[in-house]
C-alpha cells in the first residue's frame, strides 16, 4: 500500500508540474531552476522509462538550448504569449473546447464537463487562475488532485472507483485533445521549448493511461 501511495504521489507531482509549466510564463528563477541539479535528476528519473526516453531527451535539449538564447526568459515569455494567449488562427490555444468542442469557441462543452467534474469531486479551480475550466493547466491540476483523493480513500472499493475515474479522465478529457494541441504547438513554436513540453505531456498521459488500465 505504501508503494501504491508513493507512486501515486509521483504521478500527481508530474501532473502538477506540467500544470504550472503551462499556466503562466516562466520567471527568471524558473529558468534558473530548469538548469539546476534538481531538474536534471527529475528528468533523468523520467527518462529511465522507455516510453518517455525520447520526449525527455527532446525536452532536455530544449532546456540546454535556452543557455545560448539571448534574453532567454523574455523570449520564452514571448513564446508563451504568442502560443497560448493569442488567437486560434495565430496561436495554439490551451483549451479543450478549441479542439473537441462543437463550436470551436471557448467555454464549449469540455469546459462545462470540467465544471461538472470539479463539483462532483469537490476539487476547486484556483481562484487566482481566471481561465475557462478546460484550460490544460486546470485539467492537469484536477488530475493531480484526483490522484491524491485515491491515496486518501480508506475504502478499497471507493479507492478503486477513483482510479477508474482517473483512467476515464485521462482518456476522455486529456488524450482526446492534447495530441492535436501538441501538433498545433509544433506548427507555431519556432524555438520548440513548449512543443517539447507538450510532447512530453502527451507521452506521459499515454503511459499513465496504460498504467491505469493495468490497474483494472
Curated annotation (Swiss-Prot):
UniProt-listed SUPFAM superfamilies: TorD-like (SSF89155)
Principal subcellular localisation of the protein: cytoplasm
GO cellular component: cytoplasm
Gene3D superfamilies given in the database record: 1.20.120.1820, HscB, C-terminal domain
Keywords from the UniProt entry: Chaperone, Cytoplasm
Protein location: Cytoplasm
Keyword ATP-binding: no
GO BP terms: protein complex oligomerization; protein folding
A Pfam family that the UniProt record links to this protein: Nitrate_red_del
Protein family membership: Belongs to the TorD/DmsD family. TorD subfamily.
Physiological role: Involved in the biogenesis of TorA. Acts on TorA before the insertion of the molybdenum cofactor and, as a result, probably favors a conformation of the apoenzyme that is competent for acquiring the cofactor.
Protein name, UniProt field: Chaperone protein TorD
Organism of this sequence: Photobacterium profundum (strain SS9)
